[in-house]
From Swiss-Prot:
Species annotation: Rhizobium rhizogenes (strain K84 / ATCC BAA-868) (Agrobacterium radiobacter)
Taxonomy, superkingdom: Bacteria
Residues given in the record as Zn(2+) binding sites: C33, C221, H246, E250
Protein name: Cysteine--tRNA ligase
Gene: cysS
Presence of keyword Protein biosynthesis: yes
Amino acid sequence: MGTEPQLKLYNTLTREKVDFQPIDRENVRLYVCGPTVYDFAHIGNARPAIVFDVLFRLLRQVYGENHVTYARNITDVDDKINARALRDHPGLPLNEAIRLVTEKTETQYYQDTTALGCLEPTVQPRATDNIAQMIEIIEKLIARGHAYQAAGEVLFDTKSMADYGQLSKRNLDEQQAGARIAVDAHKKSPGDFVLWKLSAENEPGWESPWGRGRPGWHIECSAMSGRYLGDVFDIHGGGLDLIFPHHENEIAQSRCAHGTDVMANVWMHNGFLQVEGRKMSKSEGNFVTIYELLQTEKLGGRTWPGAVLRLAMLMTHYREPIDFSVKRLEEAERLLAKWPAADIGNAKPDATVLVALADDLNTVVAIQALHALAQAANADASILPVFAASAALLGLLPEKVEMDDAVASEIDARVRARLELLKAKNFAEADKIRDTLLAEGIQLKDGKDPATGERITTWEVKR
């Protein structure tokens, strides 16, 4: 793939645009902070999902589809989840209530991101499946003098790391001088943060050398990125709001545990989003979830297709703030209406589109080039495949897969049979159907109808 352009990415760590050089061209590794599954994702959460999906597509284009590993985590242990579970299911044991909340929210997130045209990440680890890895990192930090026990908690000792604060450009003296609240008496320094805390009897918890407890927020991502991508990997992404304290503390934990100079070589952050000129908040009445935008008339008195939301996001450079509005959605919809339907065939993306995206994901220029290509394709059908390949690189033209109606009907019948087996709790036979379909290139996605709570299953030809 040597003819592809040189990727240039803005690195928050160095505050400059750099030539991207992967550690291993055979396995380019990307980690993005995913959702905390206590509530449906809002349209601000849609932005990193879309932005880093474009990066994932671009990396696959440059290095090959089988040479990129994209990990996006699911945070399914958090005090916000506990609070939501108690609120929504007061009559149930807390662990059962938590399971209902996290399953419903995670399923909806997958449905939302699929509707937005996002490819499925290579791995989507859950925090609760990686507790052992978190405990192992904490043990290393204690052994190396970077963490301590106090008042039922294990805390990271920020003063033990000489260059703590590199990502956010904050130093410990500034944090101490700027503290507005009294420092917890058990902390050595104001910036020290929780790695592990004890759980009450009714709270979720796991056995550890420090007692039955649960992890702090930051340690979760250090454990999952390390497990699936290694001690040092290529790119770490997320929203600007995560730079401090979350990403700063991830770096501190990972570097001090593994003895490395960096955690990730490049740190990328997407800008903030506001709605109709105001910060999005429930108190302002302009808080909108992805589900509400796609399925209800909450914004603009109508529903909006996922492709329209995606294009509306990409019409602004990812590092710039977005003012999300009905006007912007209408503009994106008008633009999409002018683009022809087309099959990719064996075509490659247009060089102008590819070069724009290689320049720090310049989707603004890429979309301008794509629109010019669409106009040319409307006049000359021979250009259609190149337009389609270029649009697919932005996730704006899903690949069409021709399938005989009889074959599709047969797949539908097997999916329905599996649902009946699941209802009968015959999980072994249900899994056989799922695995057979997967071997045939058919990916199943289980979910629940938000309105009825009934189990639903959709399928697609695996990309």
